[in-house]
Amino acid sequence: MSYPFSGYDIGVLVMTSWVPKPMGHISQAGNYNFPVYYYPVDSTNTTNIHGGDKAILPDLITAAKHLEEMGCKCITSSCGYFAHFQKEIAEAVDISVYLSSITLIPFLIPMLRKDEKLAILCYNKEKLNMELFHSCNVSKKMLERCIIQDVIHEKEFSNIIKDQGHYNITNARKELVDITKDMKKNNNIGAFLLECTDMPPCSYYIQKELNVPVFDATIMVKFLNTIYGRKNK
């Protein structure tokens, strides 16, 4: 197959959102020393993506096929709740699909000692249902090794969904550090996994404070590029 241009190994399905994209956010192109192809899907919003509304699936598949046609070798997304559509989109294209950091759970569980837990920090844990986990090949047995905490009631992070029109990353950072400190205080945590793509700008501070590895969608993109963007050098 011939392409109109080349060099975009990673493609990102982008949910429409007003939230700023600081360094660390998956949709901040300045994070990467390699090109990333961003493709906005106009019919998406926090309601239908977080809720896994199958009515938008045709639009998502069309967008994924566009990324494939443009030469992308791997597709991810700008919101962790795209995981609702992981299975269907993976079946619809002939390139690799990792729509959410949730797809990392089967990779992370084996690294834990038997007495350790994987702490998952998400926006709204009610939206992380078993259908979503199954779509990402995450079993109930794996989830027994996990602790899930959300931030939906935190003042700064709740501004994202409530469309308040303002978002203070410094305050959000403090919220996340405080939450993760409490989680670690009461549990033997071997690693943190951040579902929400608005959280990675805070990953460094969480890891520095707790001295525990923190995995997120932005790190996942960099990892995927080492594979799909491998160079002969």
Label the model's feature ranges.
Residues 90-112, 207-225:
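Short, acidic/small-residue loops that bind anionic groups at enzyme active sites
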Residues 58-63, 81-88, 92:
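N-terminal active-site wall of soluble small-molecule enzyme domains
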Residues 165-204:
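Charge-patterned, long linear interaction tracts outside catalytic cores
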Residues 1-55, 124-167:
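N-terminal glycine-rich anion-binding loop in soluble enzyme alpha/beta folds
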Residues 68-71, 109, 184-185:
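Non-catalytic positions within long, well-ordered alpha-helices that form the structural scaffold/packing
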Residues 50-66, 171-179:
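Glycine-rich, highly charged phosphate/nucleotide-binding loops
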Residues 18, 74-85, 98-104, 123-127, ...:
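Gly/Ser/Thr-rich loops at beta-strand to alpha-helix junctions
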Residues 2-6, 189-201, 207, 218-233:
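C-terminal and late-domain segments of enzyme folds
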